[in-house]
């Protein structure tokens, strides 16, 4: 992760780019708002933008559209290009300083046409062009990304965007000499390690995220991570207090910044590495020109390095150097009336609300025999199921019993897991989804949108299509409004058939200090909250 000595390039990254945005790439503080994903999974883009997207974009499900899948497009889901998940998700951003090469070309042309123009004026024009480019927003695809400069990431052990990768392994060797002192924050701010067992501190973090974390482009929805969800996401087995890294105002001790890391064993092709997942980077909206986010990234890197860990995994809705995989969110309406009322989605031409509700209607009972909530007695069997199943993918976790217990045992309003037990008492399959509501802003009646996110779904005997249809039924019965899923693992086999609608933004997966060939979304077996 970030270098331990303060290089000139890294120091420069703290001084440039004063956009009123937030990010984790160190190049642009915008992308805390983009990495995790829009609330509810890619919500709220303008209808005009969505219609334009649909004209030129065809869902790629790996198969032929069924009639029901075609019908499901009658209700349009408004989606922005933000996505779940920061470093879930590192949350990254546009290239700092924009496309300076373009600025240089403009200057050269102007100089040849009029060599009497002062060099200083040409330099001023170049700087203006760079700022304009930076303000045009983060790169959403490889073509856009290759035109940008990434001054922060260019100093980091990550592959270059144009690099052809055929090897596997660490980019930099593990270090022995790790910086012992925290990095310096801008004047007026101080570090604080957050003790989330303290209810007041947990409430402070909840408030910071609730008021400043991921929103959609139209400021209609905002993720609403409950305090209980935060404890689940931030304190898995092996969690460390010092990896809950906060920033406060020195004068009044107000919490204005946060970044976290949690440990995980991740298999990358044939190598299993102990690494961290980086998540929940957030800087208060009013302080995003203070360059706090780059220091947060470097500080969490230093703290992780001190524990002997030198690799990380993260996701972002923008393109940085260099994605190992790109996935897409899909969305399945469970409560069409509410989704239309809050403008999460809208009715297409010649489609009434009643027809839409009929289209998305689900049975009242599940189909799979032996389906029941997971219990503590199932931990070992679930661990065996998931670890064997995930071996077919190129990027996947390797879990022990404690991790399976933490991530999958049902917790109300946080995680739901159902197992399939056959007549002989053997567990053959399981499904899981976690709960992440969004606050609905500026609506007179609806204050919250309840979204389910597909987690891990393992099948050995039950067809995956049947298993996921049961997941939709359970989510509907539990009062969810929408069910979201990425097109990773084997999900493409059921998305269209179960009337999911495709989102219009990608979720990139990244590895820090690890080089390996890229992989397709169906070979990704890792889901970050």
Swiss-Prot record:
Reactions the enzyme catalyzes: N-terminal glycyl-[protein] + tetradecanoyl-CoA = N-tetradecanoylglycyl-[protein] + CoA + H(+); N-terminal glycyl-L-lysyl-[protein] + tetradecanoyl-CoA = N-terminal glycyl-(N(6)-tetradecanoyl)-L-lysyl-[protein] + CoA + H(+)
Keyword Transferase among UniProt keywords: yes
InterPro entries linked to this entry: Acyl_CoA_acyltransferase, NMT, NMT_C, NMT_CS, NMT_N
A molecular function GO annotation: peptidyl-lysine N6-myristoyltransferase activity
Residue stretches of biased makeup (Basic residues): 46-57
UniProt keyword annotations, A-Z: Acyltransferase, Cytoplasm, Membrane, Phosphoprotein, Transferase
EC number(s) recorded for this UniProt protein: 2.3.1.97
GO cellular component, one term: cytoplasm
Subcellular location: Cytoplasm; Membrane
Polar residues: bias regions: 61-82
Ligand binding (tetradecanoyl-CoA): 153, 281, 283, 289, 291-293
Family the UniProt entry places it in: Belongs to the NMT family.
Entry protein name: Glycylpeptide N-tetradecanoyltransferase 2
Organism the protein comes from: Mus musculus
